[in-house]
Amino acid sequence: MAEKTADETKSNSAGETKSNGSVPRVVLVTGASRFLGGYLVRRLAQNPDIERVIAVDSVSPSKDMLRRMGRAEFVRADIRNPLIGKVVRGAEVDTVVHASTLQRAPKSGSRAAMKDMNVIGAMQLFAVCQKAPTVRKVVLRSASVVYGCSAKDPVKFTEEMSARRRPPGGYARDSLEIEGYLRGMGRRRPDISVGILRLAPLIGPQLTATVGHYVSAPVVPTIVGRDARLQLLHVEDALAALECATVSSVAGTYNIAADGVVMMSQAIRRAGRIQVPMPLALFRSAGSALVGSSMRLYTDEQLEYFRFGCGLDTTRMRTEMGFSPRWTTMQALDDFVRATQTRRIIGSSWIDRAEQTLTAIVGGNAVSSPGSQNADVLSMPDTGSGVVER
């Protein structure tokens, strides 16, 4: 893979797709040093119908990621800098995939710095696309976070719906602004095809994302009286959806999510962890005592997702975009648990037997299973921590 400066630059998909035969010639992908952007560059570079793939980011990817990108060209450039225009015009880019939106403020920065990188960067990039005569398509990686999370949410959000209340997090507000600026560019340049993909929370064996990290804690704090509905998206399906939007002629806004939902309690149980319900007022403080400093890393919008969850209507994704995810939500979760080889604190078979026993007791028929109480309760070695095998 060749790494270039701005001055030097003049599918076997996981999901099933219906290609419309509109393969681009030169594709530029932002956010290439991150997981999703980097692996998308890799997939596009493997497409022989695409002449050039240009990966852009303000920091260089790891050596391993550079190697994975193959024939793609890396350009170290900040999309807030006017030099990005020189890259687009010099390479005669016809398709731009914007996948560099930050979900949290950088370690050395503030919320203002995050907004500057997200919103101002997107405005600058879209302005360049609007002025470039060769650009014919812009694809935005957005997120379902734009719908927010609340007790008043519908069972499933369609693309026409909006949040029931203003999202509390900066990532959601930035995503809404970025979507608005992209639609505005599309109105001013109707010859440019605009695609917005609102991805459900990602999970996968190669990615330490929010939900996977949360349910991997030995003890998982939850809120009394709440059991969030989780609709996830396997990272391979996310990459396949972005590739589909890039190489086909589809345009518009699409919810991208796997089939089905998993309740938070069910996800914790399938991961073999222990759920500890607590009042909302103690959720962050008591949660920090249980899981340590990692609790403080979650944003307000992520904590609200753990409380309420969010369901997405994917009818348009299937009928208009022609994309069908390979993994269901349950399968994506199980793939993460299996691949990360998480040590189970409570065996799932023991939980199944306990549920059957309780059901029988409630029904008036106590079930006795000699010799089963001590089987498969703990797959962790006994460390004398006081955990009883029951």
Where do the model's predicted regions map?
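Glycine/proline-rich active-site loop of Rossmann-fold NAD(P)-dependent oxidoreductases
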Residues: 176, 190-192, 203-213, 244-255, ...
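NAD(P)-dependent short-chain dehydrogenase/reductase
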Residues: 152-153, 184-231, 235
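NAD(P)H-binding glycine-rich loop region in Rossmannoid oxidoreductase-like domains
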Residues: 73-120, 149
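Conserved Rossmann-fold NAD(P)-dependent oxidoreductase catalytic core, especially the SDR/UDP-sugar
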Residues: 123-170
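Glycine-rich NAD(P)-binding loop of the Rossmann-fold in SDR/ketoreductase-type enzymes
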Residues: 113-124, 173-174, 233
